[in-house]
Amino acid sequence: AEWISTFRKAGDSILAELYKTKKSKNDKASEINKRIKEYREGKIANLNTVAKSESWDNQTLLNEILLLTYASYIVMLEYRNKVWKYEYMAFARRIGELWEPFCKLAFDFPIKKLTLVDPPDFDEVQTQIKNDAIGYIESLDLSEEIKAELKRHYDIPWTMVDSGGIKLGLDLHFEQNGIHYNCDFKSGFSSNEKGNTNRLLLVASIYNSLGEIEKNILFVRQTEDENNHYL
């Protein structure tokens, strides 16, 4: 309640300024979202400073940041609605947009030690897989002619792969205790998501081929009977 009150005061100030302008409702909505986000980031920075000076533990800091952020989302939705009424689909989509960064806070301010990492480059992964396969073929007790034929057949499917079109980057990648976690966040499912589902299956299969240190996680907001067919 305290954080909601704090953000509503900021929202009132922003709204008072916007009502004096001739901006469109679209521009006013964007400005509200932008200004409240900036205000929230400033408050989070202040919390970090206080946490260090008062030696907060990670759990205490994360809890306060989650409360602060949740309050900012409530006010952001309220004040955007004051200048431009939400339609049902626009509201549902906006909730999905806010859900992912809210979940990521637990990884940006972790309780247990972890390291955010960049996803691997597909060309490098492809080279590694090819080298492993060729090394295995070379180790077989076969004639050079048969080995060459095996390599030729092995190369055929790779010629059908457009390396530039396969991006291994998901919504979140982190390393913890020697394990690489590759995570994607899905709020809901709509008719245009089938291609994305197929991509996720492809990317997950590539990570699985890299060995036991790769773990894939899919975070979903809605259950299957509530419009999430990723499950």
What do these predicted regions represent?
Residues 1-110, 119-121:
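Nuclease-adjacent, charged terminal/linker segments that flank catalytic cores
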Residues 86-92, 155-161, 184-192:
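Surface-exposed cleft-lining segments at the edges of enzyme active sites
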Residues 107, 170-188:
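Conserved catalytic cores of phosphodiester-cleaving nucleases, focusing on short active-site segments
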Residues 118-177:
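Active-site metal-binding core of divalent-cation-utilizing nuclease and nuclease-like domains
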Residues 182, 218-219:
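Structural beta-sheet core signal
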Residues 189-199, 227-229:
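Active-site-adjacent loop/helix micro-motif of nuclease/hydrolase catalytic cores
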Residues 194-210:
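Short, charged, amphipathic alpha-helix that recurs within catalytic cores of restriction-modification
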Residues 220-231:
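Domain-level recognition of nuclease-like catalytic cores that cleave nucleotide substrates
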